[in-house]
Curated annotation (Swiss-Prot):
Residue ranges of the motif DEAD box: 471-474
Keyword vocabulary terms for this entry: Acetylation, ATP-binding, Cytoplasm, Helicase, Host-virus interaction, Hydrolase, Isopeptide bond, Nucleotide-binding, Nucleus, Phosphoprotein, RNA-binding, Ubl conjugation
Identification of the protein by name: ATP-dependent RNA helicase DDX24
Source species of the chain: Homo sapiens
Modified how: Ubiquitinated by MDM2 without targeting DDX24 for proteasomal degradation. Instead, polyubiquitinated DDX24 promotes interaction with NIP7, a component of pre-rRNP processing complex, and associates with pre-rRNA molecules and pre-ribosomal particles.
Cellular localization per UniProt: Cytoplasm; Nucleus
Induction: By type I interferons.
Gene encoding the protein: DDX24
Length: 859
């Protein structure tokens, strides 16, 4: 069996210089006799001969690193540890060896413990340079990394001295992952309010560092029944009320309880490799800084630690016991396959030993190997495999990333490992994350079901699942969405059913019932959906057995009290005017929602022409770009994000001031979740709807479902600025349309030309989109575009919000000059709306004494 090829292995050089991958040539290559009749057809006339090597030794890479690789090893980042320990053990007695240690750039890392693990401890074999071979893929990665780190440099750096261990460790600090969640500095808060809710002590410590002094209402009502009584929970609360911690803390408690019940005693063997003991004991022994650095990494930047898991060690033991010493020569990676003698170094001829001596040497080697493997098998038994204990299902990828980061922040002192499985990212990297056997997995249904079908060993047995969480459950179980979820729930409730499993279901619109469409109501045998019927249907789809505890903290309006709702009635073509007016008049962190991706792309091009650089977020974007745009939107104070309903649910973006519904959502649930991106955690926020003629029907449905007692107020717009706004939008539309058509035509024509060149055919002018443009027409179009852009640039250079003033003397244009009068920065959209409300409340009080006059005259 051959090791899995890894990135850390150096590539074979094209020169004729021989290289060794852990094999030392003792004898000579012997020619293999082949029957010449086998090559009678003449297809292998260039073949010279076949050679085989039977007399060789296994060389320890750690003993002679200079003879392993002839070229400079690739640089790798690692945590540095001093090499002085090896010198104290007497491994580097010669001064030449000490010089090599000083030259090495990367000092021995934590992975040196795993490197020592595979060295033969017999001094006789040690002198001969024999070594063991690891058959496990991940262990192979570890050893190859260590070999690369100890490889010497070709060039001598005379002026540079070796860094001390403290300096090297301080220089290499792990990079913090980018995220849109605000960083909370270590500030200890009083968490006495959490103690009555049966929160574990490590979680209390993390809550203190995060500054969460008191639980939110949904957390206070959920934690005790979920942790103490172990009840299934159906939780409904407003957006931004802390539902993530309401299900994260009970899940962490369930994992900790399982670890206590299945805790294994530490291994008695003091010489056990640190890489093995760290897998289980590391949950309690590693420092909080390491746990935080490990958990804060995004899926894209996650680096798998070089640790040998129990399952990996068992595979390694099976591989070693199954093969002899001679067979292990073939296990040194795929780079040696088919290369023959070119992969080895021909050293000085060594006198050939007798056959009896060779047999004795082989017996000693195999005996030492078996003894070491027996010790490892005992270590494997001491540490059982960690099953999957917690599973969180979310509808969107961004929400899954956010939930994982929240869980990692709360579980930073518990040692619990988490993993994320979402689409749009590398499947192989997520498989490596699952190889670490995390206790908690946060996933979207599609990628999770894909890995389950591939029968990953960590996802095979879901009967041991202790906690199942379905976030945004009403969206997850909607008909026509997430087909994989129904198959997954069916499997969990049938073949993988666990009666001890706890199910937690949360959403902001869990109990919100909207009216069904007319085409469904007119059908026979249709029942009106109410709150109880919706919950029963939800429980049936998820497979919850028994009576769960229902916690409903939503208002009748379903929105937050601190949210201010407003609207603007306009024509469809006028939506661009009011959107541009609002973004220019009230700058800040604004989130604009639309129902379609095409609308998002058109708005993005239009605003870019107007010197507003918006960020976009929709389903057709690459996942890395989606996460990058979210992070940038949370970092910039004055920024615009154009998004579809992908960003409507669950995202906790800090300090979003305005949510603008460019197109009215189709259902009331989407409206509640869109508006919930602002006014989070007792902060104020504004929700603005641009209502066109085609949006009136959806607006009335939302107004009726949310049971609004008062009419939504109109947003105040200063009409004196609209003429300038319309002129800018008119020019921007012409430029955007022309550029879009030209781009589409060039894209289509380029594809047609490439296809014709591949087929070797000639194209006709009719096949070009818009016809094949002449040079004169193209020059005329470009000249027209320059004129439009120059005119728009002139308008954009002038201030938009100005006030006219009277002058004593006539002007050249015959019009009064416009002087700049910028609005005060302290005046926000919320303050303008509140002023308008105060004016309306004062007006009806003035004409009250005049009302009884008509009644007296009638008498």
């Amino acid at each position: 069996m051959k090791l899995k090829d890894t990135k850390s292995r150096p590539k074979q050089s094209s020169c004729g210089k021989f290289q060794t991958k852990g094999i030392k040539v003792v004898g000579k290559w012997k020619e293999v006799k082949i029957d010449p009749n086998m090559f009678a057809d003449g297809q292998m006339d260039d073949l010279v001969c076949f050679e085989e090597l039977t007399d060789y030794q296994l060389v320890s890479p750690a003993k002679n690193p200079s003879s392993l690789f002839s070229k400079e090893a690739p640089k790798r980042k690692a945590q540095a540890v001093s090499e002085e320990e090896e010198e104290e053990e007497g491994k580097s007695s010669s001064p030449k060896k000490k010089i090599k240690l000083k030259k090495s750039k990367n000092v021995a890392t934590e992975g040196t413990s795993t490197q020592k693990e595979f060295e033969v401890k017999d001094p006789e074999l040690e002198a001969q340079g024999d070594d063991m071979v690891c058959d496990d893929p991940e262990a192979g990665e570890m050893t190859s990394e260590n070999l690369v780190q100890t490889a010497p440099k070709k060039k001598k750096n005379k002026g540079k001295k070796g860094l001390e261990p403290s300096q090297s460790t301080a220089a290499k600090v792990p990079k913090k992952a980018k995220t849109w969640i605000p960083e909370v500095h270590d500030q200890k808060a009083d968490v006495s309010a959490w103690k009555d809710l049966f929160v574990p002590r490590p979680v209390l410590r993390a809550l203190s560092f995060l500054g969460f002094s008191a639980p939110t209402p949904i957390q206070a009502l959920t934690l005790a029944p979920a942790i103490r009584d172990k009840l299934d929970i159906l939780g409904a609360a407003e957006t931004g009320s802390g539902k993530t911690l309401a299900f994260a803390i009970p899940m962490i408690h369930a994992v900790l309880q399982w670890q206590k019940r299945n805790a294994a005693p530490p291994p008695s063997n003091t010489e056990a490799p640190p890489g093995e003991t760290r897998t289980e004991a590391g949950a309690e022994t590693r420092s909080p800084g390491k746990a935080e650095a490990e958990s804060d990494a995004l899926p894209d930047d996650t680096v798998i630690e070089s640790e040998a898991l129990p399952s990996d060690i068992a595979a390694e033991a099976r591989a070693k016991t199954g093969g002899t010493v001679s067979d292990q020569a073939l296990l040194f990676g795929d780079d040696d396959a088919g290369e023959g003698p070119s992969s080895l170094i021909r050293e000085k001829p060594v006198p050939k030993q007798n056959e009896n001596e060779e047999e004795n040497l082989d017996k000693e080697q195999t005996g030492n190997l078996k003894q070491e493997l027996d010790d490892k098998s005992a270590t494997c038994k001491a540490y059982p495999k960690r099953p999957l204990l917690g599973l969180v299902l979310t509808p969107t990828r961004e929400l899954a990333v956010q939930v994982k980061q929240h869980i990692d922040a709360v579980a930073r002192f518990t040692g619990i490992k988490t993993a994320i499985l979402v689409g749009g990212m590398s499947t192989q990297k997520q498989q490596r994350m699952l190889n670490r056997r995390p206790e908690i997995v946060v996933a979207t249904p599609g990628r999770l079901w894909e890995l389950i079908k591939e029968k990953h060993y960590h996802l095979r047995n879901l009967r041991q699942l202790r906690c199942l969480v379905v976030d945004e459950a009403d969206r997850m179980v909607e008909k026509g969405h997430f087909a994989e979820l129904s198959q997954l729930l069916e499997m969990l409730n049938d073949s993988q059913y666990n009666p001890k499993r706890q199910t937690l279901v949360f959403s902001a619109t869990l109990t919100l019932v909207h009216q069904a469409p007319a085409r469904i109501l007119h059908k026979k045998h249709t029942k009106k959906m109410d709150k109880t019927a919706k919950l029963d249907l939800l429980m049936q789809k998820i497979g919850m057995r028994g009576k769960p505890k229902v916690i409903d903290l939503t208002r009748n309006e379903a929105t937050v009290e601190t949210l201010t709702e407003t609207k603007i009635h306009c024509e469809t073509d006028e939506k661009d005017f009011y959107l541009y007016y609002f973004l220019m008049q009230y700058p800040g962190r604004s989130l604009v929602f639309a129902n379609s991706i095409s609308c998002i792309k058109r708005l993005s091009g239009l605003l870019k022409v107007l010197d507003i650089m918006p960020l976009t977020l929709h389903a057709c974007m690459h996942q890395k770009q989606r996460l990058r745009n979210l992070e940038q939107f949370a970092r910039l104070e004055d920024c615009v994000l154009l998004a579809t309903d992908v960003a409507a649910r669950g995202l906790d973006i800090p300090k979003v001031q305005h949510v603008i519904h460019y197109q009215v959502p189709r259902t009331s649930e989407i409206y509640v979740h869109r508006s919930g991106r602002t006014a989070r955690a007792t902060n104020e926020g504004l929700s603005l709807m641009l209502i066109g003629p085609e949006d009136v029907i959806n607006f009335k449905k939302i107004y009726k479902t949310l049971k609004k007692d008062e009419d939504i107020p109109l947003f105040p717009v200063q009409t004196k600025y609209m003429d300038v706004v319309k002129e800018r939008i008119r020019l921007a539309r012409q430029i955007e349309k022309s550029e879009y058509r030209n781009f589409q035509a060039c894209l289509h024509n380029s594809w047609i030309e490439q296809a014709a060149a591949a087929l070797e055919i000639e194209l006709e002018e009719d096949m070009y989109k818009g016809g094949k443009a002449d040079q004169q027409e193209e020059r005329r179009r470009q000249k027209q575009m320059k004129v439009l852009k120059k005119e728009l640039r002139h308008l954009l250079s002038q201030p938009l919000f100005t006030e006219s003033q009277k002058t004593k003397y006539p002007t050249q244009s015959g019009k009064p000059p416009l002087l700049v009068s910028a609005p005060s920065k302290s005046e926000s959209a919320l303050s303008c709306l509140s002023k308008q409300k105060k004016k309306k409340t004062k007006k009806p009080k003035e004409p009250q004494p005049e009302q009884p006059q008509p009644s007296t005259s009638a008498n």
